C-alpha cells in the first residue's frame, strides 16, 4: 500500500498540486532503494519499475528520523494495522498531518484514542477510506444525496479476491489483521455508512475470511447487503461490484468491465463516463487540499471510522452468535 500512496503523490505533483515526496521510511532496507515490489489485488496505478530516486528522496529505516524532518508536513501510514494508531500519534505529536490506512484499528478504544490525540494536537488525521473517492462510487453518493433518481430502495455490494500472499503472514493471522472482515470488507461497510449512516443491526453469516452481511438501515425499505472475502484460489481475479436500486433507476458497477458503471432507467441503459483517476488519487489529493487549506474538513473523518469499527465489531459478534446483533451507538 505504501507504493500505491507514493505513486498517487507523484501523479498529484505531476498534475500541478502543491506537493512533493520528500522522505520514505521502511524497516526493510531493500524497500529504501526505490525499486518496486509489486503486490496487491487491484491496479493502483503504482509503477512496476523504479518507484522513487533515493538521491532525491530521503530514506529512513527509523520512522522517528523521518518525523523529525522539518521538510515533512503530511505522513501516509501504510503499515500493518497493529501499528497504525501508534505511528499516527507519533506523527501528530511531531507536528505532522496524517493519512492513515484502513482499518484504522481493530477496536473502538484504539480509534477513540487516536481521535483524542488529533483533537489535542490540532493535526489532521484522516482515515484512507478510498471508496469515498472512487469513480463510480463517489457518483453513487452524489446521486443518493441529490435524489436525482429518487431514494435508494435496495443495495448490494460485493468485494472478493484471492487471499493475500504478501505481508509475511500478517493477513493470515486474523488476530492481527482482523481477516477479510476488517481488512477487505471494511470498504463496503464504510460505504454503507457513508450512504445510509450507522446501521441499527447486522446479520452476518460465513467466516472471518468470507462473509455476507445484511444491514438494517432505517432509510432503506429493501435489503442492504455486502459480501466480502478472500478466496482460496490465487488465480481468482479481483471482483468489486455493486447493484443499487433507486426508485427510478438501477445503478450497476463492475470494475472488471470496460464500462464499469451503467445506469438502467425506464427507457434506456447508458454508460456513465468516469474519471481516469482512482480512489487512491482522490483521497490523497483531498488530504493535500486539507493540508494546504483548499478544503476545510475531511470527507472521511475519524469519527466515521469509529462508527464503521462499531459496525464491523457487531458483524463479528453476529458471526459468532449466529443471529442478528444490534450495533452499539
What name fits each language-model region?
Residues 131-205, 322:
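Predominantly a Rossmann-like dinucleotide-binding segment in NAD(P)-dependent oxidoreductases
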Residues 14, 74-76, 219, 289-329:
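C-terminal helix-rich "cap/oligomerization" subdomain common to oxidoreductases
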Residues 61, 100, 108, 127, ...:
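Short loop/edge segments at beta-strand edges and connector loops
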Residues 4, 274-285, 300:
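Active-site loop of classical SDR/Rossmann-like NAD(P)-dependent oxidoreductases
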Residues 15, 95, 168-176, 265-270:
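Short glycine/proline- and charge-enriched loop/turn segments
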Residues 183, 189-258, 284-295, 328:
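Contiguous beta-strand/loop segments that form the cofactor/metal-binding neighborhood of enzyme cores
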Residues 1-94, 120:
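N-terminal glycine-/serine-/threonine-rich beta1-alpha1-beta2 phosphate-ribose binding loop
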Residues 73-74, 80-132:
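Beta-strand-loop-alpha-helix segment that lines the small-molecule cofactor/substrate pocket
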Amino acid at each position: 500500500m505504501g507504493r500505491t500512496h507514493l505513486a498517487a503523490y507523484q501523479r498529484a505533483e505531476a498534475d500541478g498540486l502543491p506537493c512533493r515526496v520528500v522522505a520514505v521510511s521502511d524497516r526493510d532496507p531493500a524497500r529504501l532503494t526505490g525499486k518496486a515490489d509489486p503486490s496487491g489485488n487491484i491496479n493502483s496505478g503504482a509503477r512496476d519499475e523504479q518507484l522513487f530516486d533515493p538521491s532525491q528522496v530521503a530514506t529512513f529505516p527509523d520512522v522517528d528520523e523521518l518525523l523529525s524532518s522539518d521538510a515533512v508536513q503530511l505522513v501516509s501510514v501504510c503499515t500493518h494495522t497493529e501499528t497504525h494508531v501508534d505511528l499516527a500519534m507519533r506523527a501528530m505529536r511531531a507536528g505532522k498531518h496524517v493519512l492513515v490506512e484502513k482499518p484504522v484499528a481493530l477496536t473502538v478504544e484504539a480509534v477513540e484514542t487516536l481521535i483524542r490525540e488529533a483533537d489535542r494536537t490540532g493535526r489532521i488525521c484522516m482515515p484512507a477510506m478510498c471508496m469515498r473517492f472512487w469513480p463510480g462510487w463517489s457518483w453513487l453518493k452524489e446521486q443518493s444525496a441529490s435524489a436525482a433518481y429518487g431514494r435508494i430502495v435496495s443495495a448490494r455490494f460485493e468485494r472478493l479476491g484471492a487471499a493475500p500472499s504478501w505481508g509475511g503472514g500478517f493477513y493470515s493471522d486474523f488476530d492481527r489483521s482482523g481477516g477479510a472482515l476488517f481488512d477487505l470488507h471494511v470498504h463496503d461497510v464504510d460505504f454503507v455508512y457513508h450512504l445510509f449512516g450507522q446501521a441499527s443491526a447486522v446479520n452476518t453469516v460465513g467466516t472471518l475470511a468470507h462473509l455476507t452481511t445484511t444491514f438494517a438501515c432505517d432509510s432503506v425499505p429493501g435489503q442492504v447487503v455486502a459480501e466480502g472475502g478472500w478466496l482460496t484460489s490465487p488465480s481468482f481475479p479481483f471482483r468489486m461490484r455493486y447493484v443499487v436500486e433507486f426508485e427510478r433507476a438501477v445503478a450497476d458497477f463492475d470494475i472488471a468491465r470496460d464500462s464499469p458503471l451503467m445506469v438502467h432507467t425506464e427507457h434506456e441503459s447508458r454508460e456513465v463516463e468516469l474519471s481516469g483517476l482512482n480512489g487512491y488519487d482522490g483521497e490523497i489529493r483531498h488530504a493535500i487540499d486539507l493540508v494546504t487549506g483548499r478544503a476545510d474538513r475531511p470527507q472521511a473523518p475519524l469519527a466515521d471510522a469509529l462508527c464503521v469499527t462499531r459496525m464491523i465489531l457487531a458483524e463479528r459478534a453476529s458471526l459468532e452468535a449466529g443471529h442478528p446483533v444490534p450495533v452499539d451507538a
